[in-house]
Amino acid sequence: MAKVVEVGRICVKTRGREAGRKCVIVDIIDENFVLVTGPKSLTGVRRRRVNIDHIEILDKKVDIQKGASDEEVLKALEEAGLADFMREPVRIARITPFTL
C-alpha cells in the first residue's frame, strides 16, 4: 500500500539536524514540498518547509485542518493518544561513502 501525502499524516524526518524526529504534515505546498511541525514543544521539530524526499510517511494520521496551529496539532495528538509515540525518536541508519 502506497502511503499518501496528506494533511494530518505523521512522518519521520530522515535528513538534516532533526533527522529521526517525528512530525505532522500541516499543509501541502506543491508536489515536492510540505509544511510540517512537531510541534516544537513535543518533538523539537519547528514548523518548516520540507522536501517530500526527506521524510518517511507513517501509517498514522491525526484529524487536523489544513494550516492548523501548533496548539491545534498538539491537542489533536493528545486526543488521539499519540503524544508519547511522537516523543520517541527513530534511529536513522547513516550511510557513509565508501573511500579507498
Curated annotation (Swiss-Prot):
Keywords for the protein's UniProt record, in alphabetical order: Ribonucleoprotein, Ribosomal protein
InterPro entries: KOW (IPR005824), Rib_uL2_dom2 (IPR014722), Ribosomal_eL14 (IPR039660), Ribosomal_eL14_arc (IPR023651), Translation_prot_SH3-like_sf (IPR008991)
Record-level GO BP terms: ribosomal large subunit biogenesis; translation
Entry superkingdom: Archaea
An example molecular function term from Gene Ontology annotations: structural constituent of ribosome
Pfam family, one: KOW
GO terms under cellular component: cytosolic large ribosomal subunit
UniProt key word Magnesium: no
UniProt xrefs under HAMAP family: Ribosomal_eL14 (MF_00721)
Family label: Belongs to the eukaryotic ribosomal protein eL14 family.
Entry protein name: Large ribosomal subunit protein eL14
Organism name: Aeropyrum pernix (strain ATCC 700893 / DSM 11879 / JCM 9820 / NBRC 100138 / K1)
